[in-house]
């Protein structure tokens, strides 16, 4: 049974979740949307406004009539710092972005490095925090497995076995979320496209590195026991990893892509397969689908979708995971 403090936190969270949309609401509208009484909303909103979390502004709701106070989240109250690094077509880069409480991008920068180790990551984060002291969470995306805060099987060898999560939390004294880049991308895709009732798998084939996939099953991200779920680069293709990497170029990659796609459909039975990565073009999907039909009946094949760029979904996936954590923490 929840105590009064727990009920209060839960009710405030309901209001906060409603205001995440970025829209402004009156107390009466908030009460209607949340099921709370107007008196309770008044109390909670006053407390949240005093803390600086929300802003109340007078606004005329109709052409005639009295002004009403509408409430929205304060975009300056706190920020989320998103950090991701990658190795694409031989270029190592790190991107830092600061997102407001409603997911608006307030700052974004990408820099390339010949060596991208933990020191570089810390330096880039420190530079951003000098500008945005109100960052309350740091969300990090890695092209690797991120088991227990440690980077493993990384595309960037200088980050192999680095305990990045505890390292960053110790230095910057803020909570850190560290996860595989594909997890953020597919989660952001499902949240932004409002696919909470579907099974969606994102399939990524970049050049020069092993492929990866990630799946959201009706709103729940499937990560597996060791956060290893979706690592199709480790399927048995009848060759070593080195030989597989040699084949991961156009057009020799396509048979490997077909094999992985058949495995994904058979095991996950998704509504939608979303293909991305520079080894794929939109015209490839019809051939891949025809190849899958040789093994899987047409009625069990999912929708095939080509996504040329995942960057926006990546950032929004990081944002939504940060918001989920905030909701569960408060």
Whereabouts are the PLM-identified features?
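Short glycine-aspartate micro-motif
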Residues: 80-84, 137-139, 199-204, 212
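ATP-binding/phosphotransfer module of carbohydrate and carboxylate kinases, centering on a glycine-rich
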Residues: 1-57, 62-66, 70-106, 117-134, ...
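Glycine-rich phosphate-binding loop and adjoining helix at the ATP-binding site
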Residues: 108-192, 286-295
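Short glycine-rich anion-binding loops that position phosphate/pyrophosphate groups of nucleotides
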Residues: 143-145, 208, 279-280
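Glycine/GP-enriched mid-protein hinge/lid loop-to-helix segment characteristic of carbohydrate kinases
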Residues: 174-265
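Short clusters of small/polar residues that mark proteolytic maturation junctions
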Residues: 59, 110, 226-227
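Hydrophobic "anchor" residues
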Residues: 105, 151, 221-222
């Amino acid at each position: 049974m929840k105590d009064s403090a727990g009920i209060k936190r839960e009710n405030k969270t309901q209001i906060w979740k409603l205001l995440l949309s970025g829209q402004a609401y009156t107390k009466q509208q908030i009460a209607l949307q949340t099921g709370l009484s107007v008196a309770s909303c008044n109390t909670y909103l006053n407390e949240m406004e005093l803390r600086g979390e929300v802003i109340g502004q007078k606004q005329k709701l109709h052409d005639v009539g009295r002004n009403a106070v509408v409430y929205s989240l304060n975009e300056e109250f706190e920020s989320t710092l998103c950090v991701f690094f990658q190795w694409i077509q031989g270029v190592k880069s790190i991107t830092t972005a600061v997102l407001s409480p409603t997911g608006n991008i307030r700052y974004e920068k990408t820099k390339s490095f010949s060596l991208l180790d933990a020191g570089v990551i810390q330096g880039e984060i420190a530079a951003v925090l000098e500008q945005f002291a109100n960052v309350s969470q740091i969300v990090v995306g890695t092209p690797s497995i991120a088991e227990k805060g440690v980077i493993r099987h990384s595309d960037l060898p200088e980050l192999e076995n680095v305990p990045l999560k505890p390292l960053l939390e110790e230095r910057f004294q803020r909570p850190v979320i560290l996860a595989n880049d594909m997890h953020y991308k597919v989660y952001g895709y499902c949240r932004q496209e409002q696919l909470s009732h579907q099974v969606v798998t994102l399939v990524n084939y970049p050049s020069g590195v092993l492929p990866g996939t990630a799946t959201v099953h009706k709103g729940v991200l499937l990560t597996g026991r060791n956060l290893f779920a979706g690592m199709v680069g480790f399927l048995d293709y009848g060759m070593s990893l080195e030989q597989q990497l040699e084949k991961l170029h156009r057009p020799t990659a396509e048979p490997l892509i077909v094999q992985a796609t058949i495995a994904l459909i058979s095991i996950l039975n998704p509504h939608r397969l979303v293909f991305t990565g520079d080894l794929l073009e939109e015209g490839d999907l019809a051939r891949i689908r025809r190849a899958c039909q040789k093994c899987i009946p047409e009625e069990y094949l999912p929708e095939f979708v080509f996504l040329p760029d995942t960057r926006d979904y990546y950032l929004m996936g990081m944002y939504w995971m940060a918001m989920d954590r905030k909701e569960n923490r408060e």
